[in-house]
């Protein structure tokens, strides 16, 4: 279990999870606001 926790704290794993979450967030924003160069509700 100690080696598994060491693996999960590795930088490549954390950066992959972070970039995956960021990509999912951008995809969802583009799904609700397609091609929004300006946001008209400001």
From Swiss-Prot:
Cellular component terms per the entry's GO annotation: photosystem I; plastid membrane; thylakoid membrane
Signal peptide: none
Membrane topology, record value: Single-pass membrane protein
GO biological process, one term: photosynthesis
Residue ranges of the TM segments: 7-27
UniProt xrefs under SUPFAM superfamilies: Subunit IX of photosystem I reaction centre, PsaJ (SSF81544)
Pfam families in the cross-refs: PSI_PsaJ
InterPro entries, alphabetized: PSI_PsaJ, PSI_PsaJ_sf
Function of the molecule: May help in the organization of the PsaE and PsaF subunits.
HAMAP family: PSI_PsaJ
Record-stated family: Belongs to the PsaJ family.
Protein name, UniProt field: Photosystem I reaction center subunit IX
Biological source species: Cuscuta reflexa
Record lineage: Eukaryota, Viridiplantae, Streptophyta, Embryophyta, Tracheophyta
